[in-house]
Each structure stands twice: as C-alpha cells, then as structure tokens.
Amino acid sequence: MKKIASYYLMTLGLSSLTFGLLLGFYSFVMYGDMIIALFTAAIALLYGFVVYGLFAVPLQMKLQKKARTFNVMYLLIYSVVAFIAAFLFFVINEPASIAWTLQSYFYYMLSIAAAVIYWLWDSLILYKRTASGV
C-alpha cells in the first residue's frame, strides 16, 4: 500500500512541478521578466498541487482499478475534470467573469495543458509501476 501511495504522490509532485514550469515559461515569453516568471511558476506549482490533489488524485485512484497506460479515454476524462476545475477556479476568483472565462483562450490552454500533463505523468509512472510488478 505504501508503494502505491508513493506512485500517487510522485504523479502529483511531478505534474505540479511541470505545470508550474510550463506556466512560468509562458509568463516569461509573454512578459519577458524573469521575476514575474518565477513568481508565476511558484504560484502555479502551488495551485497545481492543490487542484491536482483535490480533483485528479481521487480520479486517478478510481481509474487505476483498470490500469491502462496512455489510454485516450483517460485523457478525455482528465480533460473534462480539468475544464470543470479551471472553470471553478476562475469563477471563484471573479464571479462576474463567466462569459469572459468561456471566451478566453487561456482557460482552454490551461485546462488542456493540466489534463495532458497529469495524464502523461500518470501513464509514465503507471508504466514504470506495472513493469516493476507492483
């Protein structure tokens, strides 16, 4: 059981780190300021850790009962959950922004990136786990 929990934590940590680095890089490209990029990366890492922990890890535990690596259906499920989580995050921060959120390319980019990142790390770590026989 401890071994399986370590795989969930590894997926959570690596996904959050990748998400933070991706948004930090995006911020650096958009604004050209390293301080803003580092701050964005740190905030995104924390945001990713909390949101992945609340939404993705329980879903991952449910999906791991029939463990399949690089399953496109899992990517679609993670995408739907990512869209819901990002929508809730945007609406909680700015309740009057529902129309803006749905029109924003950043909402779609953030949701798809979050889903793909988690799905990729989940599949890679699951592949490693099944190869080691755990």
From Swiss-Prot:
GO cellular component: plasma membrane
Keyword Transmembrane helix belongs to the record: yes
Gene name of this polypeptide: yoaG
InterPro entries with a match to the protein in the record: UPF0715 (IPR031374)
Spans traversing the lipid bilayer: 9-29, 35-55, 72-92, 106-126
Cellular location(s): Cell membrane
The UniProt record lists the keyword Membrane: yes
Record-given protein name: UPF0715 membrane protein YoaG
Lineage: Bacteria, Bacillati, Bacillota, Bacilli, Bacillales
Membrane-topology annotation of the record: Multi-pass membrane protein
Protein family membership: Belongs to the UPF0715 family.
UniProt keyword list: Cell membrane, Membrane, Transmembrane, Transmembrane helix
Disulfide bonds: none
